Amino acid sequence: MKILLENPRSFCVETKRALSIVNLALKTWGKLIYVNHKIVHNNYIINNLKLKGVIFSKNINSILESSKLMLSKHSVPNKIKKTTLEKKIFIIDATCPLVKKVHKKIHYKNKNTYNVILIENSQHPKIQGTLERYQKNLKNSIYIVKSKKYAIKLTIKNTRNSIITAQITLSSEKIYPIITILRKKFPAIINSHENNICYATINRKTAIKHISKKIRHYSCH
């Protein structure tokens, strides 16, 4: 059997940072550290953290008052932060800086009466937090685009005050065909997606494509 290893692999910088934060929290306060979402898609690490005393809970109401709660790198809706204040829960914020950057951009454009076209997968935790940063009003709105089909059907009243952004971990193969359709339909629209790309995700997906070609090569010989 031939084993192929491709680079980059393992976790991104922000995932490593989140793991360091939760381990530091355990060292500082001991057991009963709550985390609102799985830090990493790795059951071995998650189970190991549970054994150390980390409690993963999406239900904010189940968290005891005056506890320690770590916000995972995916971010959380504002309503959760409000509840933590009411219950005097100490927050440890491990939100990915790139996710925060998208939140700030959407909040700023919202205040300045911009429409936002968000290319996304609405089931992802990152998006749940993002959507809450946008307050709909009579002057502007947020438009969710999940596919090329959604982009083709989309109608916007004022495209001059509109921007495109996207879930930072979506693949370029999914995003750019949608952006192409939107730019053709709405030439005045601003594409601000390039500054929000998670390059760790892109590099890993590129590596997977590269190694898949190697696998096909070896399987043919």
UniProtKB/Swiss-Prot annotation:
InterPro entries: LytB/IspH. The keyword Iron-sulfur applies. [4Fe-4S] cluster binds at C12, C96, C198. Keywords: 4Fe-4S, Iron, Iron-sulfur, Metal-binding. Its cofactor is [4Fe-4S] cluster. The keyword Lipid metabolism does not apply. Binds 1 [4Fe-4S] cluster. (2E)-4-hydroxy-3-methylbut-2-enyl diphosphate binds at H41, H74, H124. This is Putative 4-hydroxy-3-methylbut-2-enyl diphosphate reductase homolog.
